[in-house]
Amino acid sequence: MSDDMVEFLNQLPGWAKEMGFHILTATEDEVTCEFEVAEKHHQGYGIVHGGVHCGVIETLASIGAAIVGGKRGQRVVGLENNTSFIRAVRSGKLTAQAKPVTRGRSTQVWEAWVRDADGKLVAQGRVRLLCLDDKHTI
């Protein structure tokens, strides 16, 4: 995907922008991003909230699936997000990566990993997405 598309994705309004996710790559084979942990990412104990991990995983899976679906004239929406929290994080830069497991005509499945600055796994997940033809409304 072109640098213009990555720049476009980074300018989109919404939750991912508010969370400070910075897309690094976006192709039908891999989507990556990074973000610096801030207080807005914390839950009550001062560690990154599990919803942030779920959100970054679903965001990257959705971008990748949308690239695939877009080539077919489809839109995609999430059906299921199963994220495991492996290691607590309080601060630092996190990097996330998503890759497809299957890119079917009606559903796609993507796996994703979130790692800390030392490369240690902090969360991993799997997202199942529904591919909708243009005749369907969201």
Question: PLM features: what roles do these ranges have?
Answer:
Residues M1-I138:
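Terminal targeting signals and extreme-terminal segments of soluble enzymes
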